[in-house]
Amino acid sequence: MSALFELSAVGVRFGAVAALSDLSLRINAGERVALVGSNGSGKSTMLRLLHGLQRPTAGRLRAQAASRQAMLFQRPFMLRASARANVALGLWLAGVSWGLACRQAMQGLARVGLAEVGERSARTLSGGQQQRLALARAWVLAPEVMLLDEPTASLDPHAKREVEALMADFGAGRDGRPMTMIFASHNLGQVKRLASRVLYLERGRLLADLPVQDFFNAQRLQATAPAAHLFVKGELV
């Protein structure tokens, strides 16, 4: 199986703070990987590292150069423009003519159930609509790898279900090729539904790397999660 990312003893420090320490692992094409751990465990830093927004300060990271990536944040940035223009901009920057980019943007918005808001200002949309718009913005670029940093954390239950359904749909890929999806989440139910593999981080260290079924085995979970961690209504806090 082709490795999209290979980390060897990778570390990231911000001054005296070790955000990641001695991280060694491979992520293969087509995997659906959940990053779990309490706040400050290194999940966001790892996503930024994989996306090229952060360089390792120790060790080595190898990434497949040809892979097209998209990253979604918990609170996506919206331009002061229409929803259609927000989606079209990435295509235009990739060399697509503006007219074609706008047509493809509308197809992307329809894909996430937002065709009716194409001409509305993106900043007037609800949080759930903005996150779906961000998914459309990524989808039209046909990424092979999608990185998501707690994309449903700030959404209401209905919007969470909508975005999660789209994540599952997108993770299935297109043209018979599954997309590689790596996402950070505190929601263990979401992890169980969407992931095939779980990386458990704490204080920048990888404590467990398990198939999702093994992670949720009661004995394994108890052995993996230190007693100081609390699980409240399916959320790891």
Each model region followed by its residue ranges:
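Conserved beta-strand-loop-alpha-helix hinge in the C-terminal portion
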Residues: 205-230
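Helix-to-loop junction immediately C-terminal to a conserved catalytic motif
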Residues: 51
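Conserved ABC ATPase "signature" region
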Residues: 99-117
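Conserved ABC ATPase signature
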Residues: 121-125, 129
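The feature captures the beta-strand-to-loop junction immediately N-terminal to the Walker
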Residues: 36-38
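Catalytic Walker B motif of ABC-type/P-loop ATPase nucleotide-binding domains
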Residues: 146-149
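H-loop/switch region of ABC-family ATPase nucleotide-binding domains
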Residues: 185-186
